[in-house]
């Protein structure tokens, strides 16, 4: 095993995520601005080992990027809506077209009567109406939409629950450190 949790068996890499990687992911997803040295302190590894692990997690697409959470209301986006979109052909590039609309925050292809659920943010109901008429209904194959306005949000975010009990953390750390 190398320092980034990759195992080589008969020359083939088995890209596992060990508990140290999980700890790093848990730390970074809560605070992407945390220093490498602080992560190293928390997981009890050398900063160089942590940096290598983070680079490998990025290269493998497990860490897809870093961003700041901006308060929408401070920029005038006071209305959130969930829109069910029905199309004549589910798929058919519709998801990509919906995702290209700036006000659209999320696009999910779903099973059931509708083809997509999208989350949008607008400044008010008037701008929501314009968005529906001029952008969403203009997308190829859209035949119907059903809009639900969000009254209050209790939880919003993208933090994943990361299970840190998967393997014996201390055993992995000892192997990495050669102790």
Where are the regions that the model predicts?
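A compositional/biophysical signature of low hydrophobicity enriched in polar/charged and small residues
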Residues: 1-179
């Amino acid at each position: 095993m190398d320092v980034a949790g990759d195992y080589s068996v008969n020359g083939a890499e088995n890209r596992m995520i060990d508990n140290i990687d999980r700890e790093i992911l848990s730390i970074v997803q809560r605070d992407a601005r945390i220093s490498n040295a602080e992560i190293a302190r928390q997981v009890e590894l050398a900063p160089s080992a942590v940096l290598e692990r983070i680079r490998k997690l990025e290269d493998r697409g497990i860490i897809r990027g870093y961003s700041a959470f901006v308060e929408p209301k401070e920029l005038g986006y006071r209305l959130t809506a969930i829109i069910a979109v029905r199309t004549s052909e589910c798929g058919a590039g519709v998801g990509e077209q919906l995702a290209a609309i700036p006000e659209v925050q999320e696009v999910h292809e779903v099973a059931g009567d509708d083809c997509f659920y999208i989350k949008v943010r607008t400044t008010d109901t008037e701008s929501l109406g314009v968005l529906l008429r001029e952008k969403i209904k203009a997308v190829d194959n859209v035949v119907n939409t059903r809009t639900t306005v969000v009254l209050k949000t209790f939880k919003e975010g993208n933090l994943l629950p990361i299970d840190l009990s998967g393997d014996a953390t201390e055993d992995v750390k000892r192997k990495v450190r050669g102790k």
